[in-house]
């Protein structure tokens, strides 16, 4: 029984997702339906948490909009998420960056990860 469920979940999972980690700055293209038409809306911010649960995986992105912190959680394999693009890699030493909620301005910046040679 569980093999059938795993096979169905594997079939529904997206295969073309980029590798990203907490601290990375990403642009998530989200499908937004307005009336009878559909358009893409970009949400750019820092990944503060990732939840890996197969088909039920999710990640949280935080950005500052008009001086106000905005967090949005996306289901990784959702059909609403059109694409994910990694803008820059962040060098962090935590899996969950919830401490960024208390920081503002320059204190909330994350160093860029240097490429390995």
Curated annotation (Swiss-Prot):
GO molecular-function terms, A-Z: structural constituent of ribosome
InterPro entries: Ribosomal_bL19, Ribosomal_bL19_CS, Ribosomal_bL19_sf, Translation_prot_SH3-like_sf
One GO BP: translation
A GO cellular component entry from the record: cytosolic large ribosomal subunit
The UniProt record lists the keyword Ribosomal protein: yes
Keywords, sorted A to Z: Ribonucleoprotein, Ribosomal protein
Gene3D superfamilies: 2.30.30.790
PROSITE patterns on file: RIBOSOMAL_L19
Functional description taken from the UniProt entry: This protein is located at the 30S-50S ribosomal subunit interface and may play a role in the structure and function of the aminoacyl-tRNA binding site.
NCBIfam families on file: rplS_bact (TIGR01024)
Similarity annotation: Belongs to the bacterial ribosomal protein bL19 family.
Protein name: Large ribosomal subunit protein bL19
Native species: Vibrio cholerae serotype O1 (strain ATCC 39315 / El Tor Inaba N16961)
Encoding gene (name): rplS
